[in-house]
Amino acid sequence: VNEQSSAPTRRLAQDLRARNLFAEVACAFNLEEPKIEDVVKLVSAQRIFIVPITISEGYFTEQIIPHRLGFSSADQSGYKRFKLCANRTLIYCRPIGTHASMTDVLLSHARAVVVKHPFPHAPETAETVLFIAGHGTKKNANSRKAVEVQVELIRERGEYADVLPAYLEEEPFIADCFIATKEMYLVMIPFFVADGLHAMEDIPMLLGEPKTLVKKRLASGQPAWRNPTEHKGKLL
């Protein structure tokens, strides 16, 4: 487990507290304390909004969280997104990754990385293929949905030579991005909430960086992947 994976959520909670939009703001986690099932104990408000800080409506958000919070039973396929618990109202929101603003967020990241790392020269978007990298899992088909939606929305804008999905655990795999297109210039945007294990370690290694080098770079405070890196005749 990468300890940095919870940092963005904790920072977001601090920012929301500073804005005074809600009476209370608290965090709960799957693998860290406080746990998801402790949500009601963490605040005293009568109405509690529970927002998954995840990208897609997948196995975790549609089965694990609802079950732990009592919105659904283990064998229940559907559930209501609000419930009463000891005279308090719990409202289960949809993941932040499904919000309409995510398209502009992804495009902003894609443009920024090219501007920051133009060597040997900044390629035109019309000669660049953009990959949106997600997790993917056979446990729940919705895990792909957020990535596929963004791929189509960005493709419709016609800025890039092509826009393609890539996944950790499903086809098309991240490691196959170099053979997925004839274009030389590639940009890959990890569609993950945090710079955790997948974004910082798994993806660089899947793209061809040796594990020892990735670990060494991270230990010294460097990015695991150096932009741009040439691999298999492509510049990513």
Q: What is each residue range found by the language model?
A:
Residues 1-236:
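Active-site-proximal alpha-helix that buttresses catalytic centers in soluble enzyme cores
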